[in-house]
Amino acid sequence: MPPKTRAAGAKKVRRKEKKNVAHGHAHIKSTFNNTIVSITDPSGNVISWASAGHVGFKGSRKSTPFAAQMAAENAARKAQEHGMRKVDVFVKGPGSGRETAIRSLQAAGLEVGAIQDVTPTPHNGCRPPKRRRV
């Protein structure tokens, strides 16, 4: 009897492993249109993530502080399943969901250590978009 082989189109599925990480980093990227929350271990491997669009908001509602709050709660809940208890927060971008996302990480049960703003500022690099005329 010949050895069993995989079907031509079948892929090898990597099972999601349960990491047990007590301390990590929460990266909050808050733009004018969306808020993305990624929770990583100290070396930068993503443990959980959520965004306002991923949580179920569409269009202009993605840019609201409430959408950022829901995204942060969702990411924190997933991270706590992996044993996360304490995070250092890195905030990037000018969006409206920055403070709300940090507050909801605390409310979800994660202990927030340091909060750092890592918004990139150009040393006169690219030309910015033109001013809106409404």
UniProtKB/Swiss-Prot annotation:
Q: Name a Pfam family for this protein.
A: Ribosomal_S11
Question: In its UniProt record, which GO terms are filed under biological process?
Answer: translation
Keywords in alphabetical order: Ribonucleoprotein, Ribosomal protein, RNA-binding, rRNA-binding
What HAMAP family does this protein map onto? Ribosomal_uS11
Subunit (UniProt) = Part of the 30S ribosomal subunit. Interacts with proteins S7 and S18. Binds to IF-3.
- Identify its protein family: Belongs to the universal ribosomal protein uS11 family.
What the protein does comes down to:
Located on the platform of the 30S subunit, it bridges several disparate RNA helices of the 16S rRNA. Forms part of the Shine-Dalgarno cleft in the 70S ribosome.
Q: What is this protein called?
A: Small ribosomal subunit protein uS11
